[in-house]
Amino acid sequence: MRKILLSIILIGIFATPHSLLATDQVVNIYSARKEALILPLLKRFKKEKGISYRLVTGKADGLLKRLEIEGSLSPADVFITVDAGRLQRAKQAGVLQSINNPILKQRIPASLRDRENYWFGLSQRARTIIYNKETVDATNLSTYEGLANPAWKGQLCIRSSNSVYNQSLVASMIEVNGVEETESWARGLVSNFARPPTGGDTDLLKATAAGQCSIALANTYYLGRLINSKISSERKAAQNLAVFWPNQDEGDRGVHVNVSGAGVTKYARNIKEALSLLEFLVTDESQEWYAEVNNEYPVVEGAEISKTLASFGTFKADSINLTILGVNNPTAVKLMDRAGWR
């Protein structure tokens, strides 16, 4: 009875007068990305490929739970979310399937997709050091590890340990430096907090610009939003900030990057259409749209970036396979708790 009721509900959610025609090509999407960051591409996809779409947006954890509950009755063909750790969680939950697609494998670097091809990165975001140009001499900055130096006591703004972006950063450091060294670093970081972690990356950047802290760890696209904001006070705040790329020395690992990404769901009924969508999302045109609209870095080598991203300069990115962010996530969360990172 439960499955029958669920099936009726799902049909009601997705059905339209034309959606039940067998001749229609359609792809059903569950997306944790905001509608504004996916809908324009879907409209272009429909126009170019002649494939209709049905889009459901929501919180990542809620959509993942929904896929688990729906099981084989799920209408979803594609799951889109942010953070490689979340994508790995979807894989571990058994709601995705492995896809051997030569176009995706050729377009997306191996480090930015699942080792077993359950999910694929669609755009990159760099989590780096952003500092107040008036209070910080950039020559004193060097690495993520250096932020634990007592010289920065009372000067660091950062999000809470609940932030999946911080969890993934710590997960990457565990892979490189090991648990013991990373925990020592996290304790040093906590001792340098300018204030208890609060708010999102935009709040941190505004606080840094206002002098409440000197440095912040944030995703670069948040700075891009301030730079291009329609609000004059936000544009003014951005003028006080600059990007520093850590861990750039020869032999060092580079800047921590993460992805937004997608996978084909385990019970997808429209696999051909789902793959067509994923292939479309890694065309140069789609990649450049993400770069321009949300200031995210392309995953496809050679795709153009926005003027805003170009103004941040070039950097060497960490090349570890992002699958490890999900694998190390439970360890990272426990480590952050032990270190007092709330």
Can you say where each PLM-predicted feature lies in the sequence?
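Ligand-binding pocket segment of bilobal, Venus flytrap-like solute-binding proteins
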Residues: 161, 168, 172, 177-246
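A structural signal for short loop-to-beta-strand junctions that line the ligand-binding cleft
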Residues: 74-79, 97-129, 145, 156-158
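Mature extracytoplasmic/periplasmic domains
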Residues: 260-319
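Short beta-strand->loop
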Residues: 30-33, 96-105, 115, 119-120, 131-133, 139, 145, 232-256, ...
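Early extracytoplasmic/lumenal segment of secretory-pathway proteins
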Residues: 23-88, 342
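Periplasmic solute-binding protein
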Residues: 87-95, 113-142, 170-171, 257-263
